[in-house]
A protein has these predicted regions:
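Gly/Gly-Pro-rich "capping" loops immediately C-terminal to redox-active cysteine motifs
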Residues: 38, 42-78
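Soluble non-cytosolic domains of exported or imported proteins
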Residues: 19, 31, 69, 89-94
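Sec-dependent N-terminal signal peptides
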Residues: 3-13
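Electrostatic cytochrome c docking/interface patches
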Residues: 12-33, 110
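C-terminal capping alpha-helices of c-type cytochrome domains
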Residues: 76, 88-110
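Glycine-centered loop/turn positions within well-structured domains
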Residues: 35, 73, 84
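Surface-exposed patches in mature extracellular/periplasmic domains of secreted proteins
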Residues: 36-39, 88-89
Length: 110
């Protein structure tokens, strides 16, 4: 019981968040709702080829766009819209902000 009383003030004074904003953004970017943003937009948001496929005699590519230059408001609006390929995630504005900040922080690292 004495040990609990000694530890309790430390627990109460510690940061109330389980993870930092940056960690939250990274977690969401790499696994928001089962399908990672990075699978189509790349580890840094740089965009990437998702798949190459044949249509008749032509080889076409389905490409996830570079999202590093998107503004926060553009990202919020884009995530509200229907996209033919991209799943809907129904992210909150706080979640989109965490993802946006995660991408912004990594811009110079490629």
């Amino acid at each position: 019981m004495k040990q609990l009383l000694l530890i309790l003030p430390l627990l109460l004074s510690s940061n109330e968040d389980f993870m930092s904003h940056d960690e939250y953004g990274e977690l969401l970017y790499h696994n928001p709702r089962g399908i990672s943003c990075a699978k189509c937009h790349g580890d840094l948001g740089e965009g990437m080829t998702i798949v190459n496929y044949k249509e008749g005699n032509r080889t076409l590519s389905l490409v996830g766009p570079d999202i590093r230059q998107k503004s926060f408001s553009t990202m919020v609006e884009s995530l509200k819209k229907y996209h033919k390929v991209m799943p809907r995630y129904y992210l909150t504005k706080k979640e989109v902000k965490a993802i946006y900040d995660y991408i912004e922080k990594r811009k110079g690292k490629n």
